[in-house]
Structures are given as structure tokens and as C-alpha cells.
A protein has these predicted regions:
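Beta-strand-turn-beta hairpins that frame and shape the catalytic cleft
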Residues: 1-3
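Active-site beta-loop-alpha junctions enriched in small/polar residues
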Residues: 7
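CN hydrolase (nitrilase-like) catalytic-core segments centered on the catalytic cysteine
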Residues: 10-111
């Protein structure tokens, strides 16, 4: 599923969140300006890929963690072409990191687990057409980052004094 935000929409997070909640895995953002790090930020904040297309300046493809997969520039190619693997899950690292050795032992080179140590994020990615990340999450009782935050928020709301 895809979503589209246009130009100045980059300044309103609620539109991006709404697209993600409706299942968008890639959000395209055509714009009159490049957006810079805002494009990368929208990717990691919403845990989905972003693809920008601008008349002038930099256009780019960003993965779910905000990493640029491909980009254009004033002095470079006018096309950004790069692979996006959508068979992955974005997780809060703790406590799921405790299960990573078991997952790696079972799936070996058919998966990749990347840890973003400072942010405490982890990404589990399938490298094989016969491995579905959703099945790994179910098998090892892992929650996506969104599910983890929703669970934590329900506890916060229960005990907040206001």
C-alpha cells in the first residue's frame, strides 16, 4: 500500500500518521522543495519508506529507519533508483533483543537483524522469499514498535494522575 503527501504537507505529522495507520508502507512526497532531513525523519517517525520527488534540489528514497537508499543532487543524476525491502519489522529493542540469538540461530542468513543502539530500535528483515517477518514476530512473541508503544501508552494512561 502507498500513500501520498504533497509539498507543504511535510509540516503536519497527523497526515503522515493517518496514512501509516491505514497501512501505507511507502509514502510518496512530490514537492517544490527538497525537504532535507525532514524526508528522512518522516520515514523513521512513521516506520515506513519515503520517496521524494522535487523539481529542484535533492530527491531521495529513504528506508524505514530514515537511511537514504538513493538520492539525486544538483550535480548528480536526475533519477533516484534503489531497492526497498518491505518484508521487515521495526521494533523497540528491549526486551525483544533477548530473543534475537534464537531467531538468528533458526533463520541464519535468511534474515538480518539490525540494531540502532542509541535509539534502541531494531529492524528484522527477511532476506529470503520463503521467510515472512510476520511469522517470526508471531513465533517469537515480538511486537512491532507501534504495538509496543501502544501497550506502554495504555499503562501510562491508566496510572497518570491527570
Amino acid at each position: 500500500r502507498i500513500g501520498i503527501q504533497i509539498c507543504f504537507d511535510i509540516n503536519w505529522q497527523d497526515g503522515w500518521e493517518a496514512l501509516r495507520k491505514k497501512g501505507a508502507e511507502i509514502i510518496f512526497w512530490p514537492s517544490a522543495f527538497g525537504g532535507g532531513q525532514q524526508v528522512n525523519t518522516m520515514a523513521w517517525q512513521n516506520k515506513c519508506c519515503t520517496v521524494s520527488s522535487t523539481k529542484y534540489g535533492v530527491s531521495k528514497i529513504c528506508d524505514v529507519n530514515g537511511t537514504e537508499v538513493a538520492a539525486t543532487g544538483h550535480w548528480s543524476e536526475h533519477w533516484a533508483i534503489g531497492p526497498l525491502n518491505l518484508e521487515k519489522a521495526f521494533l523497540h529493542t528491549w526486551p525483544y533483543v533477548l530473543r534475537f540469538p534464537e531467531i538468528e540461530k533458526k533463520y541464519g542468513r535468511r534474515i538480518r537483524i539490525r540494531n540502532h543502539h542509541e535509539e534502541e530500535w531494531s529492524i528484522i528483515e527477511s532476506l529470503s522469499p520463503d521467510v515472512r517477518v510476520a511469522d517470526i514476530l508471531d513465533e517469537f512473541d515480538l511486537k512491532t514498535h507501534e504495538q509496543h508503544i501502544a501497550s506502554a501508552e495504555s499503562v501510562q494512561l491508566k496510572y497518570r494522575p491527570f
